[in-house]
Amino acid sequence: MSKPFVAVLMGSDSDLPTMQATLDVLKTFDIQFEAKVTSAHRTPAATHAYVTDAEARGCKVFICAAGLAAHLAGAVAGITTRPVIGVPIDNGPLQGHDALLSTVMMPGGVPVATVAIGSAGAKNAGYLAAQMLAVGDDELAAAVKAERQKAAEAVQAKDAKLQAKLAQ
């Protein structure tokens, strides 16, 4: 079996600009990943085959992005017992609200961990996958913790700058 990896599945190639945030986070932590366009509706057999094969090859987390009806994450969760993270894409007439509801409303026993709509959610999907993998990887856990510390220091620096400006 190869090194553990994350599978990033998108319902359309138009989802890539949003999902680039996920890929960037995974790269930050040197997490191996595969990215693929597949559809719960248009290519269900291919989606099933990929998920089954990816799991056999060492995929530990699936991140699924889709807009509108957004059944990809739910379809994947029905195939695997690996964690599935759903990213609702902010497109269509409802700007992702339909995708959010389609992704989050799963039957009991078939969970999808759903993040926010759009790019913020895509970024958090990468961090959530890293945290899931870090449960069994102390080095990755330390890297995630260091990244959080770096973000905290950036906030503190901004506050210090604000306080200095207000003191003038």
Q: What residues fall within each predicted segment?
A:
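Short glycine/serine/threonine-rich phosphate/pyrophosphate-binding segments
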Residues: 15-19, 44-47, 66-75, 94-97, ...
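N-terminal beta-loop-helix "entrance" segment that forms/cooperates
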Residues: 35-56
